[in-house]
C-alpha cells in the first residue's frame, strides 16, 4: 500500500511520531507517539492547511511517499463513529490511544475530519512492524502561497 506524508522538510526523515507526542493530534493525546499519513497527496495538503492561517508563511515542505504492508492495517468505518465525531477530539483521541496502547496493528485507517469519505492513516511507531515502513521517495513540495491566503 502506498500512502503519503507531508511534513516540514527539516523533519522529513523523522518517523518517530515525536511531533504528535509533543502536541497531540486528532487521534492521539499528548504524550503518545503517532504518525499521520493520508491516502492522497491532496488530502495531505488539506490536513496542513486546516492548521495554518493567513499569517503563517508556508514553510519548506517535503512529501514522503511511503509503502506499508497491507496486512498491518486496521480500519474504523465512518458509520461506526458517533454523530458529530469531528467536533469531539477527546472521543477520537481515546480511539487512537486505545489502538496505540493495545499495540496489535501497525496502522489504523481513519476517516478524515475534513473529507470523511477519504482516509488518513495513524501509525503506531512503537509497533514491532514499524521497521516495515519504507520511504520510497522524499521530494520537496512547494505549496502555492495562495493556499495560505484563504
Q: Where are the model-predicted features located?
A:
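Active-site and NAD+-binding cores of ADP-ribose-processing enzymes
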Residues: 2-17, 29-30, 57-150
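Short glycine/proline-enriched, acidic/aromatic patches that form the donor-sugar handling elements
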Residues: 24
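Extended catalytic/binding region for NAD+/ADP-ribose chemistry, centered on the ART fold
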Residues: 27-47, 121-126
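Short, intrinsically disordered, mixed-charge
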Residues: 43-57, 140
Amino acid at each position: 500500500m502506498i500512502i503519503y506524508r507531508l511534513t516540514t522538510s527539516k523533519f522529513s526523515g523523522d518517523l518517530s511520531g515525536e511531533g504528535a507526542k509533543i502536541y497531540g493530534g486528532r487521534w492521539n493525546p499528548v504524550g503518545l507517539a503517532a504518525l499521520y499519513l493520508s491516502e492522497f497527496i491532496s488530502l495531505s495538503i488539506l490536513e496542513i492547511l486546516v492548521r495554518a492561517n493567513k499569517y503563517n508563511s508556508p514553510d519548506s515542505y517535503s512529501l514522503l511517499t511511503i509503502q506499508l504492508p497491507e496486512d498491518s492495517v486496521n480500519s474504523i468505518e465512518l458509520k461506526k463513529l458517533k454523530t458529530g465525531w469531528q467536533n469531539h477530539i477527546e472521543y477520537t483521541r481515546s480511539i487512537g490511544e486505545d489502538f496505540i496502547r493495545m499495540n496489535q496493528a501497525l496502522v489504523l485507517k481513519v476517516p478524515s475530519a475534513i473529507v470523511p469519505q477519504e482516509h488518513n492513516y495513524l501509525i503506531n511507531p512503537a509497533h514491532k512492524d514499524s521497521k516495515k515502513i519504507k520511504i520510497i521517495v522524499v521530494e520537496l513540495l512547494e505549496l502555492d502561497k495562495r493556499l495560505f491566503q484563504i
